[in-house]
Regions:
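Short helix-capping/linker turns of helical repeat alpha-solenoids
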Residues: 17-19, 32-33, 52-55, 68, ...
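Hydrophobic face of amphipathic alpha-helices that form TPR/SEL1-like repeat modules
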Residues: 25-32, 60-74, 103-112, 144-148
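TPR/TPR-like alpha-solenoid helical repeat scaffolds
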Residues: 141-144, 148, 172-176
Length: 176
């Protein structure tokens, strides 16, 4: 039987009193388990934290649901669609709070047409927004979009700008 993670009582007490940081920390701890019941608890605590406005919990839920939906896509398209819907909901919530990685993930929904109408212009707009908020991968994606005229006119100057900006952001991350 898979072993459950050690959960500090103080953390549970904080989470139970409505501390969203503690709730999200609990979710992350439970998610490290291989026990199915603990995975369910992880989701429950993350949902509580997200409901209280915890932006990282919102993003975490969106990413988790999207990952699960992709795994289900072949064997159960209807169930996958449900989970893509959950993912879209939470990524949209996190994006509304300016979470750059959530915005970039949301762009993918519009690019692929997952539970939303395919909208390349909206996808590019979201990639740009994430890039402007400092998301290095979004900067790289935007540079690629400009280089290859993917849904917009090619623009070598903008492509170079976004490549350079991504390099600078990544260099700062390396130095930290």
């Amino acid at each position: 039987m898979p072993k459950s993670p050690k959960i500090p009582a103080e953390l549970v007490n904080l989470a139970t009193t409505g501390n969203s940081d503690a709730q999200f920390e609990l979710a992350e701890l439970y998610m490290q388990s291989e026990n199915e019941d603990d995975i369910t608890l992880a989701e429950e605590w993350a949902l509580k934290a997200a409901a209280l406005g915890h932006v990282e919990a919102m993003y975490w839920l969106g990413e988790g649901y999207a990952f699960y939906a992709k795994e289900l896509r072949e064997e159960d398209p209807s169930e996958a669609e449900t989970y893509f819907g959950h993912a879209h909901h939470w990524l949209k919530q996190a994006a509304a709070l300016k979470h750059p990685t959530a915005i970039l993930e949301l762009a993918g929904f519009y690019r692929r047409g997952d539970v939303v109408d395919k909208d390349v212009a909206k996808s590019i707009e979201l990639v740009q927004q994430a890039a402007e908020l400092g998301e290095a991968q979004a900067m790289r994606d935007l540079a690629f979009i400009y280089e290859n005229a993917l849904g917009i006119d090619a623009d070598e100057v903008k492509a170079k700008y976004w490549h350079n900006k991504a390099d600078a952001v990544e260099q700062c991350l390396v130095l930290k």
